[in-house]
Swiss-Prot record:
Cofactor: Mg(2+)
SS bond list: none
Catalytic activity: orotidine 5'-phosphate + diphosphate = orotate + 5-phospho-alpha-D-ribose 1-diphosphate
Protein name, as recorded: Orotate phosphoribosyltransferase
Gene3D superfamilies the UniProt entry points to: 3.40.50.2020
GO MF entries: magnesium ion binding; orotate phosphoribosyltransferase activity
EC number: 2.4.2.10
Family: Belongs to the purine/pyrimidine phosphoribosyltransferase family. PyrE subfamily.
Upper classification of the organism: Bacteria, Pseudomonadati, Pseudomonadota, Gammaproteobacteria, Pseudomonadales
Annotated residues for binding of 5-phospho-alpha-D-ribose 1-diphosphate: 26, 72-73, 99-100, 103, 105, 124-132
Keyword Magnesium in annotation: yes
A biological-process GO annotation: 'de novo' UMP biosynthetic process
Amino acid sequence: MQAYQRDFIRFAIERGVLRFGEFTLKSGRTSPYFFNAGLFDSGLALARLGRFYAEAVIDSGIDFDVLFGPAYKGIPLAATTAVALAEQHQRDLPWCFNRKEAKDHGEGGTLVGAPLSGRVLIIDDVITAGTAIREVMQIIDAQGARAAGVLIALNRQERGKGELSAIQEVERDFGMPVVSIVSLEQVLEYLAEDAELKKHLPAVEAYRAQYGI
């Protein structure tokens, strides 16, 4: 685990974004942990989050031309990542996002920001079922661009309805990498190292044994 990944997990726990206990997921599974990126909800938190995304972008080595934030949650994530890449890594890259509704006045259309062209890095919080990414791929294809990869905050490393995770299905179906700031593997490592949080380790390990990939 890299230093920025350890810092990100600590930061997510401090913000209440990553919590441990008993949570019912949309899938109906009872999970011993929950991740809610919507709680990175202050200016300072968003700025720090962008720096973690930027570190993961650099770490991934993915070659791309433009950042894309899918509406709605991906919009601030793409924006703060673009700022952090420019300020921390001297990489001033274009970014854009889509609207859910087309506008019939002003600039019109469903895309806002830089042109969606060339190699596109999609920025989002998590991939649960992969439905949102499939919709994004249609938008990218319609512009004649191509997806270079997807960057998310947390990879739950968890099977969907079949043997693969939603992330593995996206990688298989679109032939592109999905990378994350951290994965469940690193969360487990962090729990094992933390005297206070170690008590949650057995439940998370049991959950991974049942649903993990």
